[in-house]
């Protein structure tokens, strides 16, 4: 019986049933034969679409209309299909049973469904293809059996499916290709066997599938292919062998003369032989990246006149550029992750139609002229070894729109290298060795990246880039030329505190300003408004300038400027005076005065660092952007940062040592015990200095945080390493202050309990306590700033942060000597002794005066000797040297003063 007679018979039967059942359903009433729990709608005048999906059904509805053309029973709990239950649905064209619990489909389950075209059985529990249930569905065009547990396909299960076009068998448990079952599918056009467990494809596996156009075999375990496994696939255009275990190039593809798209990436293929695609002249696209390819035949890609795209990523052993003779239509070439060191001079002769060239992550050192590739639109050469861009390399590439030369070693670019690129809009030269940048011919650029070129410190005029929208520069100061000055950051606060507000909101706000600005000319006000809008729409330049990357002034405010100058002058002058009075004679210095003198020396270094910053601010006043990159990246900034951290940490460590020394000294004097020798103290001082030196060196070794800003200090925000460094310093210094506080608390508690009846050097104990209190108070803002940064607290304004870093941090170096000069009587005594010594040496130049004073000096020496003898333990309490026989002029003068000093309690 032919097809026309079958159709006539079906139409006659349908007409008879229609007459028996009455008139067809009306649109305004519930269609007859629609289950109450399903959703139904008319499909034309007579047919019905029934949707019973996701209702938790455990069996098929029994009262379905014979005119049902579409039935969706997916996402239910149906586990059985009774035989002949659906045989009445002669007009059914699409049946969906996906997402159920079917484990078996009996013979006759689909009997009578002569109009069925689409059958969906995916996401069930089938372990094999139904052996007889699918037979003789002559109208079936699409069959989905994917996402089951099918491991067996009976040889005759697809018998009679002469109209089947699409077959899904992916995501199952097949271990081989069911050759016998496919022999009856001569009309099949697309089939997927992906996501199975197939290990091998035998010869003639698809021998009778002459109409097959698309074949997916990806994500299997295929490790070998029969040399004739693809024989008979005369119409195949797409072959997907990706994500398998192939060890050898699939030479079986040579019989696929109509193949257009081939993919075998993510395998274990190590070589591509010569003339590998000689039998595939219709190839348009090849994907075989992510293979450990070590060898590619020079002629592997020759004579592929239809090839449009060639992608080969990760072929790490390729050292030569392939010969592409006869592949003149290639439009996109990607050869990344290889070891190609040079390009042939004839590359553009072979590829005149090339539009995209990606040779990134190679070892290219030199580039030939690419002027013959007139159609090039995109070139990607990042991560190579290119040193120089010559004048003729990119000449006359009128269609080139994107050029990526990032992460090379480019140090030289010819002034006219980009002069004939009128269509170029994106240029990436980041992370190179550029010290200059040619701007000729780049008027059309919209995106420019120059970040990472630390030697490129000069400003680039914005007038050369009228179309620029996004630019990335090595230094924030270079963004000042593109409207990125500090006043730009004030505009959002002036006009709108909400960043999401629109320009219309700005205009509404301006409308209210006219009433309060009667004295201003309307035209001038509108002009100012338009200028502000231009600023708001300025070029997006990064890194943006700001308070810590200023365009005009290093210090910003006059308060900071005056504070830095005052701190620097006082720190240098006062510490120099203290150090001079302490170290004016090298013969003998008491332990506490030695510590005060060393603290004064390191505080001088802090004054030097502040003075250098003040001088830089003065010389760059109003034009810091022109010198900011030079200063920030230079050795001077590193020296300033190193001196600042070294001086700050040394001062804290030495102050801690002074507090401990005072406590230990008081303990020894109260018990008349011998103190530790001065050499031990000097060794500890040296250890403190070495520790501070190590701490100050860490930023130089760990990425040079000193160059992070023109302030030359590790900022307590930004990079995690810098924040961690600052927090570690705060914790270490806090520990030092805690130790000092505990030591002095114990000392004063002992004094209150009367454990010490007398204390000789009361002034030094009080002075050290004053230093401790002052330094601790001044360190609190620094500690708070560091911890607030760690906790991402952003309520502290940048000006306050700059004030803390530039004024508060070096302030102890200024106050320490002032406290000693103003409040400590030892300074007055030292100055008096210095005056006496000066007069003594002045008289020594005159013999008459010397003879007159010799008797007086001798008398004083005797008096001082008597004083020393009367106090048997004076050498212990006074920190006198063990050798008291020496009697130089100055020490004897100072020792004479000791006879008049009595032991008094320090209360």
UniProtKB/Swiss-Prot annotation:
Domain LRRNT: 33-64
LRR repeat residue numbers: 44-64, 65-88, 89-112, 114-136, 137-160, 162-184, 186-208, 209-232, 233-256, 257-279, 281-303, 304-327, 328-350, 351-375, 377-396, 397-420, 422-444, 564-585
Protein's name in the database: Leucine-rich repeat-containing G-protein coupled receptor 5
InterPro entries, per database record: GPCR_Rhodpsn, GPCR_Rhodpsn_7TM, Gphrmn_rcpt_fam, Leu-rich_rpt, Leu-rich_rpt_typical-subtyp, LRR_dom_sf, LRRNT
Chief place of localization: membrane
Glycan attachment positions: 63, 77, 208
Disulfide pairings: 34-40, 38-52, 348-373, 479-541, 637-712
Membrane topology, record value: Multi-pass membrane protein
Subunit structure and binding partners: Identified in a complex composed of RNF43, LGR5 and RSPO1. Also interacts with other R-spondin ligands, including RSPO2, RSPO3 and RSPO4.
Residue spans crossing the bilayer: 562-582, 596-616, 639-659, 683-703, 724-744, 776-796, 803-823
CDD domains: 7tmA_LGR5 (cd15363)
């Amino acid at each position: 019986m032919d097809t026309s007679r079958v159709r006539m018979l079906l139409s006659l039967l349908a007409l008879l049933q229609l007459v028996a059942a009455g008139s067809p359903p009306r649109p305004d009433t519930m269609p007859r034969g629609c289950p109450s729990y399903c959703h139904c709608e008319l499909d034309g005048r007579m047919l019905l679409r029934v949707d019973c999906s996701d209702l938790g059904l455990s069996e098929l509805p029994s009262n379905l209309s014979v005119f049902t053309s579409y039935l969706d029973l997916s996402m239910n709990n149906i586990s059985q299909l009774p035989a002949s239950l659906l045989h009445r649905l002669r007009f059914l064209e699409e049946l969906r049973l996906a997402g159920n619990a079917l484990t078996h489909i009996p013979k006759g389950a689909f009997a009578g469904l002569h109009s069925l075209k689409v059958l969906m059985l995916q996401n069930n529990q089938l372990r094999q293809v139904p052996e007889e249930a699918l037979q003789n569905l002559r109208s079936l065009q699409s069959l989905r059996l994917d996402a089951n547990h099918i491991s067996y396909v009976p040889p005759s299960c697809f018998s009679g499916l002469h109209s089947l076009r699409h077959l899904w068998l992916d995501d199952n448990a097949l271990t081989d290709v069911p050759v016998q079952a496919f022999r009856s599918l001569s009309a099949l056009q697309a089939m997927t066997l992906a996501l199975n467990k197939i290990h091998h494809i035998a010869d003639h596996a698809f021998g009778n599938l002459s109409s097959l156009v698309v074949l997916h075999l990806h994500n299997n375990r295929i490790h070998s292919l029969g040399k004739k496994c693809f024989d008979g696939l005369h119409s195949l255009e797409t072959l997907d062998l990706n994500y398998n275990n192939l060890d050898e190039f699939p030479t079986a593809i040579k019989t696929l003369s109509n193949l257009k798209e081939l993919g075998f990436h993510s395998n274990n293929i190590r070589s591509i032989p010569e003339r590998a695609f000689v039998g595939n002249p219709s190839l348009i696209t090849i994907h075989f990246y992510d293979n450990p390819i070590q060898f590619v035949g020079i002629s592997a890609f020759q004579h592929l006149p239809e090839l449009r795209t060639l992608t080969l990523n990760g072929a790490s052993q390729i050292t030569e550029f392939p010969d592409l003779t006869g592949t003149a239509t290639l439009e996109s070439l990607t050869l990344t992750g290889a070891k190609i060191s040079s390009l042939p001079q004839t590359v553009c002769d072979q590829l005149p139609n090339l539009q995209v060239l990606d040779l990134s992550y190679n070892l290219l050192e030199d580039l030939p002229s690419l002027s013959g590739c007139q159609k090039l639109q995109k070139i990607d050469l990042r991560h190579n070894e290119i040193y120089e861009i010559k004048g003729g390399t990119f000449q006359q590439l009128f269609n080139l729109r994107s050029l990526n030369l990032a992460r090379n070693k480019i140090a030289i670019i010819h002034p006219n290298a980009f002069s004939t690129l009128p269509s170029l809009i994106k240029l990436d030269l980041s992370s190179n060795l550029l010290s200059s940048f040619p701007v000729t011919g780049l008027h059309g650029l919209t995106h420019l990246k120059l970040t990472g070129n630390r030697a490129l410190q000069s400003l680039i005029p914005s007038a050369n880039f009228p179309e620029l929208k996004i630019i990335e520069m090595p230094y924030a100061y270079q963004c000042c030329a593109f409207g990125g000055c500090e006043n730009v950051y004030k505009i959002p606060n002036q006009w709108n505190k909400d960043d999401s507000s629109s320009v219309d909101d700005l205009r509404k706000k301006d409308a209210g300003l006219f009433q309060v600005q009667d004295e201003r000319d309307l035209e001038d006000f509108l002009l100012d408004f338009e200028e502000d809008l231009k600023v708001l729409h300025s070029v997006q330049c990064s890194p943006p300038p700001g308070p810590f990357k200023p365009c005009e002034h290093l210090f910003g405010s006059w308060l900071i400027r005056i504070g830095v100058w005052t701190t620097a002058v006082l720190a240098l002058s006062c510490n120099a005076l203290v150090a001079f009075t302490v170290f004016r004679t090298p013969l003998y210095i008491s332990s506490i005065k030695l510590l005060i003198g060393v603290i004064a020396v390191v505080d001088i270094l802090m004054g030097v660092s502040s003075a250098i910053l003040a001088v830089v601010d003065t010389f760059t006043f109003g034009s810091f952007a022109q010198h900011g990159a030079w200063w920030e990246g230079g050795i001077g900034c590193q020296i300033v940062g190193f001196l600042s951290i070294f001086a700050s940490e040394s001062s804290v460590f030495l102050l801690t040592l002074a507090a401990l020394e005072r406590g230990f000294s008081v303990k020894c004097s109260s018990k008349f015990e011998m103190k530790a020798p001065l050499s031990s103290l000097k060794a500890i001082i040296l250890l403190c200095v070495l520790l501070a030196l190590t701490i100050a060196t860490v930023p130089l070794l760990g990425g040079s945080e000193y160059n992070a800003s023109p302030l030359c200090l590790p900022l307590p925000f930004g990079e995690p390493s810098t924040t961690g460094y600052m927090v570690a310093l705060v914790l270490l210094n806090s520990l030092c202050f805690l130790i000092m506080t505990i030591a002095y608390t114990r000392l004063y508690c002992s004094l209150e309990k009367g454990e010490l009846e007398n204390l000789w050097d009361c002034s030094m104990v009080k002075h050290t306590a004053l230093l401790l209190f002052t330094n601790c108070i001044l360190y609190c803002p620094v500690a708070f700033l560091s911890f607030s940064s760690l906790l991402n607290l952003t309520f502290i304004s940048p000006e306050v942060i700059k004030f803390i870093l530039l004024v508060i941090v070096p302030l102890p170096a200024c106050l320490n000597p002032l406290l000693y000069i103003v409040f400590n009587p030892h300074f007055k005594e030292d100055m008096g002794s210095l005056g006496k010594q000066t007069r003594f040496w002045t008289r020594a130049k005159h013999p008459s005066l010397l003879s007159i004073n010799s008797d007086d000096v001798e008398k004083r020496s005797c008096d001082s000797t008597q004083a020393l003898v009367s106090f048997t333990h004076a050498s212990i309490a006074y920190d006198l040297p063990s050798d008291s026989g020496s009697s130089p002029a100055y020490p004897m003068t100072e020792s004479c003063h000791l006879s008049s000093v009595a032991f008094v309690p320090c209360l």
